[in-house]
């Protein structure tokens, strides 16, 4: 093996080249690779975070939708109950008003009935008095009395 000056010169030049590359070229290259690695890691972490946030948002939106449906159902049921109560109340009020009108009509009928009885009583009394006075005033026999009473009964 012949080692000559050229080979030594090439070795020295190669060593200087390696030293120069290690000192000036490798650090910026390494820095660029590290930055690229960090950006990729951040992108993956961000995508993972976004995926988790999306799942949370989906669950929250599903929960909100479920609550909204439950609330809507409750509102509809409350409206139905309220409408039913209003309907029942209106029916009860109508029945009460009808009962009141009926009782007032019955009371009025009863008053008219009492009034008619009183008028009839007064008329019967006056007719009886008239018949009695005719019987007394007329010196009549039994047949005449019967005829007067028969006429009186027909009038009544």
From Swiss-Prot:
Gene3D superfamilies for this protein: 6.10.250.1580
Transmembrane segments: 5-27
Stated name of the protein: ATP synthase subunit b
Protein source organism: Francisella philomiragia subsp. philomiragia (strain ATCC 25017 / CCUG 19701 / FSC 153 / O#319-036)
Protein keywords: ATP synthesis, Cell inner membrane, Cell membrane, CF(0), Hydrogen ion transport, Ion transport, Membrane, Transmembrane, Transmembrane helix, Transport
Pfam families xrefs: ATP-synt_B (PF00430)
Primary subcellular site in the record, as a coarse category: membrane
Family matches, as CDD domains: ATP-synt_Fo_b
Alphabetized GO MF terms: proton-transporting ATP synthase activity, rotational mechanism; proton-transporting ATPase activity, rotational mechanism
UniProt subcellular location: Cell inner membrane
